[in-house]
Amino acid sequence: MAAAAQAPAAAKVVVATSPRAGGGGGGGGDRKVVPVVVAAAAGDEAQSEMHVLAVDDSSVDRAVIAKILRSSKYRVTTVESATRALELLCLGLVPNVNMIITDYWMPGMTGYELLKRVKESSQLKEIPVVIMSSENVPNRISRCLEEGAEDFLLKPVRPSDVSRLCSRIR
């Protein structure tokens, strides 16, 4: 029996946020509800098994990368920060992630810091991480690749970049 195409599902997740600098160790972070968008591409079920977590603080860049990934028949979850991505991954709220594509420079935790945390985690270290940036800084690119990034893409990301990555990761 063929599965029907699914519309993007919106879930709401309650997460704890840590206090800013000077907050001390009192354990009191605020809690807030954060929407998480998961979109499955219609069509080929075998390809839609590929699940990509796209992380970028820019809503425009998130929409662009999600559109490119969906046009290649991949399921996409988008989040606005590396901190949120790590929380959702560690809590198992975005299951079966095959790849993480993250912006390098974001407020709070950077994409580089997310890369390091993923690679240090016994639970997450096998997930390929791709870094994106609009800045072509050779030592930054080298550092990310040395820390275990699968690739470093310059923005704007093109469909050919995504096709190349996904063919290597399958």
UniProtKB/Swiss-Prot annotation:
Reported induction: By cytokinin in roots, shoots and leaves. Induced by infection with the rice blast fungus Magnaporthe oryzae.
Pfam families referenced in this protein's UniProt entry, alphabetically: Response_reg
Keywords, sorted A to Z: Cytokinin signaling pathway, Phosphoprotein, Transcription, Transcription regulation, Two-component regulatory system
Post-translational modification: Two-component system major event consists of a His-to-Asp phosphorelay between a sensor histidine kinase (HK) and a response regulator (RR). In plants, the His-to-Asp phosphorelay involves an additional intermediate named Histidine-containing phosphotransfer protein (HPt). This multistep phosphorelay consists of a His-Asp-His-Asp sequential transfer of a phosphate group between first a His and an Asp of the HK protein, followed by the transfer to a conserved His of the HPt protein and finally the transfer to an Asp in the receiver domain of the RR protein.
Keyword S-adenosyl-L-methionine carried by entry: no
Function noted in UniProt: Functions as a response regulator involved in His-to-Asp phosphorelay signal transduction system. Phosphorylation of the Asp residue in the receiver domain activates the ability of the protein to promote the transcription of target genes. Type-A response regulators seem to act as negative regulators of the cytokinin signaling.
Official protein name in the record: Two-component response regulator ORR6
